[in-house]
Regions:
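Radical SAM [4Fe-4S] cluster-binding motif and immediate context
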Residues: 33, 186-355, 362-364
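Glycine- and acidic-residue-enriched helix-capping/strand-helix junction motifs
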Residues: 25-38
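Short helix-capping segments at alpha-helix termini
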Residues: 49-50, 107-113, 158-159, 281-288, ...
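Glycine-rich beta-alpha loop elements in corrinoid/cobalamin-binding modules
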Residues: 44-182, 400
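Residue-level recognition of beta-strand->loop/alpha-helix junctions
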Residues: 18, 56-61, 91, 227, ...
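Catalytic cores of alpha/beta
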Residues: 128-131, 366-380
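Flexible glycine/acidic-rich beta-alpha junction loops that bind and position SAM and/or redox cofactors
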Residues: 23, 61-63, 171, 218, ...
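N-terminal [4Fe-4S]-dependent radical SAM core
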Residues: 6, 12-15, 20-27, 163, ...
Length: 402
């Protein structure tokens, strides 16, 4: 519950948690990439002078599951709560929402602990998330600035009604404050480097995530990205510093040693992307590889692959999503099949077919067997003609997809 009083001026002790997903066998499943948001938020809050601890998803996975997955999670969290935390925050997405909801409701929370949920899923279903859990506050949208304001407000026992971007319980009522706008480039560049010192020694991670931009300049109809037509790219110097920081902490991950750019579109500003890759090549040569996401439109412009350091890329993921022109128009992809094939020929000429990775979606609401077959025919042609890996996924209706 939201406590009636904190000690004004006293320090705040915060616990940040991201629960793992459950697989088809109902067992907890580890991912290969660490939850960047958790470690970034830890640094932000520590810079404000607060005490922060993290429970990484892999710590739940590595426990002996003598009972069910939820009980395993509840047991570990309740043991940690004995340390006495003022605020406990959960990072929530659609895939871990089910287990997060159950765990939050099964924990016996102390009266002086505030429970906060953040992430895309609860940002969309904020009121429902409060009505169905013991959580006190929902953090909507980008959370770094909102978290700082929220913790300061709770610390000073001030009203919550001035904090943009939160939904909260007030007695039997649910209050939804106005939205907070997207963070500016200046805001993003002012963020401290992620708190990788808190990574568990034993972990399954194979790549270090780095954020060089947020948002997307486009607005595909199926996409869950919250900030459309609002791409914000960090300057090259900032990006290189973040990569260097990740490189210094490569020893903290158990396997691998590559960088994963978590940007929704690394190639959005082609000249900037090339400058970043060139600078990284000067720093590390071919010692490290980089995962990036790109758009066919950027490849067609000719700028992105001009002087491209092919040996630096571990994977270049490109979202195509639909294998026929009518479908591409419906999802507002801004692409035709003819343009796709032209872009793939450029990729082939640059010797990048082996690292390219195309994604497709089947089962859009308007599709039938005939239209799905068109996409599968396109995929078959690409694999046979260009030797490029294609991934086909069923359409999944997730928050903000429509």
């Amino acid at each position: 519950m939201i406590p009636l009083s904190y000690r004004p001026g006293g320090n705040m002790n915060i616990l940040l948690i991201s629960l793992p997903e459950k697989n088809k066998d109902m067992k907890l499943e580890a991912t290969e990439v660490l939850p960047l948001a958790l470690y970034s938020l830890s640094s932000v809050l520590k810079c404000q002078g607060y005490e922060v601890s993290i429970i990484d998803p892999c710590e739940f996975v590595y426990l002996d599951e003598k009972e069910n997955a939820e009980t395993t999670c509840v047991t570990l969290i309740e043991e940690c709560l004995e340390e006495g935390y003022d605020i406990v925050g959960f990072s929530v997405n659609t895939f871990n929402w089910g287990i997060t909801k159950t765990v939050v409701n099964q924990i016996s929370w102390k009266k002086n602990t505030t429970v906060v949920l953040g992430g895309l899923h609860v940002s969309v279903f904020d009121e429902y998330s409060l009505l169905t859990t013991k959580a006190d506050i929902i953090m909507r949208g980008e959370g770094e600035l909102t978290w700082c304001e929220l913790v300061a407000t709770l610390k000073n026992v001030a009203p919550l009604d001035t904090i943009k971007g939160i939904t909260y319980k007030s007695g039997k009522n649910i209050i939804r404050n106005p939205d907070r706008g997207a963070m500016t480039i200046e805001d993003l560049e002012a963020l401290p480097l992620p708190d990788y010192e808190l990574l568990p020694i034993d972990n399954p991670y194979v790549e270090m995530p780095v954020e060089s931009s947020r948002g997307c300049q486009f607005s595909c109809s199926f996409c869950s990205i919250p900030h459309r037509h609002n791409w914000r790219g960090l300057c090259e110097i900032q990006v290189i510093e973040r990569v260097k920081h990740a490189k210094r902490h490569m020893k903290n991950i158990m396997r691998g040693g590559n960088i994963l750019f978590v940007d929704d579109c690394f190639s959005m500003h082609p000249k900037r992307a090339i400058k970043i890759l060139d600078a990284l090549h000067k720093c590390y040569g071919e010692e490290m590889k980089y995962f990036i996401e790109a758009r066919i439109s950027n490849i067609l412009s000719g700028e992105f692959l001009e002087g491209f350091q092919r040996n630096l890329i571990s994977q270049m993921q490109i979202g195509v999503e639909c294998g026929y022109d009518e479908g591409l128009k419906k999802i507002k992809k801004g692409l035709t099949i003819a343009q796709l094939y032209k872009g793939l020929r450029i990729i082939e000429e640059k010797g990048l077919s082996s690292v390219a990775n195309l994604s497709f979606i089947i089962g859009f609401p308007w599709e039938d067997f005939g239209t799905i077959e068109k996409t599968l025919d396109t995929v078959e042609y690409i694999v046979n003609r260009f030797g490029i890996l294609c991934r086909v996924n069923w359409f999944m209706l997730l928050p903000s997809d429509c």
